């Protein structure tokens, strides 16, 4: 079994729950998790339970959100830290659903793979 398949199997329940709650196809969530977290093996995923590379905004920090500091695009960037992988999946779904940049994605049927 490949690392991608192992990740998908391990986190499928999280992705399916988010699909039912927010309408984001589980396959899309898992694919992004695989890429962003290097199959759950990135430092960000292992240390912060952050599987999607979501950066900590000033409002996240002001609201008491935890964060870790990592060098990514720039040195010493702040990334959200979660108590659990489930919290990471939940925040990812809300991030997509509430961000106007992704609004067009939700105009498509969840099973429309052509767009």
Predicted features and spans:
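Catalytic cores of secreted/periplasmic lytic hydrolases that degrade extracellular macromolecules
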Residues: 1-115
């Amino acid at each position: 079994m490949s690392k991608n398949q192992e990740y998908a199997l391990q986190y499928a329940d999280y992705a399916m729950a988010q699909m039912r709650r927010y309408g984001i196809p589980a396959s899309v969530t898992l694919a992004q998790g695989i890429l962003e977290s290097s199959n759950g093996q990135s430092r960000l995923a292992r240390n912060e339970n952050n599987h999607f590379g979501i950066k900590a905004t000033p409002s996240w920090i002001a609201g008491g959100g935890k964060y870790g500091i990592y060098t990514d695009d720039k040195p010493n960037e702040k990334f959200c830290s979660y108590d659990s992988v489930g919290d990471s999946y939940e925040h990812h779904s809300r991030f997509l659903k509430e961000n106007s940049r992704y609004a067009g994605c939700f105009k498509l049927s969840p099973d429309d793979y052509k767009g």
